[in-house]
Amino acid sequence: MVYFTAEEKAAITSLWGKVNVEEAGGKALGRLLIVYPWTQRFFDKFGNLSSASAIMGNPKIKAHGKKVLNSFGDAVENPDNLKGTFAKLSELHCDKLLVDPEDFRLLGNVIVIVLANHFGKEFTPQVQAAWQKMVTGVASALARKYH
C-alpha cells in the first residue's frame, strides 16, 4: 500500500486540477507507443501506427489516452485505496488483455514526463516526487492481479 502525506496529496490534486486530460492522455499514450514500440501490439485495431507522427495524430490513440488518464483522476480522488480503485482494471489487463505489468510502470513514467514538460517550473521536485509516487502506486495496483 502507498501512503501519501497531506503535502503530497495537495501537490497531486493541485496540479491535477490544471491537467488537460485529453491532451496529456493522448501525448502520454502516444509517447509510450513510440518509445516502447512493443506496446503497440495491444493497439493493432487502432489503425495507422507506422510512424511517430501517425501515432501522435491517431484519433483512437488520443481517445484511449484520455480514457487512461481519466482513470488517474480516480487515483487522485482515492489515493488511499489504489488497489480497490484499480481492481477491475487489473483483472481486465491481466486475464483478458494479457498486458505485461511492466508496461504500467513505463506508462507511469511517461505520464510524469508529459506533465513535467507541460508544467515546466511549476513541476517542482516535490511535485515530481509526489506524482512519481502516485504513478508507482497505480502501476502496483494495476499489477496486483498478476501476483
Curated annotation (Swiss-Prot):
The keyword Kinase does not apply. Gene3D superfamilies: Globins. Keywords: Heme, Iron, Metal-binding, Oxygen transport, Transport. Signal peptide: none annotated. PROSITE patterns: GLOBIN. GO terms for cellular component: blood microparticle; haptoglobin-hemoglobin complex; hemoglobin complex. Residues 3-147 form the Globin domain. GO terms for molecular function: haptoglobin binding; heme binding; hemoglobin alpha binding; metal ion binding; organic acid binding; oxygen binding; oxygen carrier activity; peroxidase activity. One of its GO terms (biological process) is hydrogen peroxide catabolic process. It comes from the Eukaryota. Gamma chains make up the fetal hemoglobin F, in combination with alpha chains. Belongs to the globin family. This is Hemoglobin subunit gamma. It comes from Dugong dugon (Dugong). The gene is HBG.
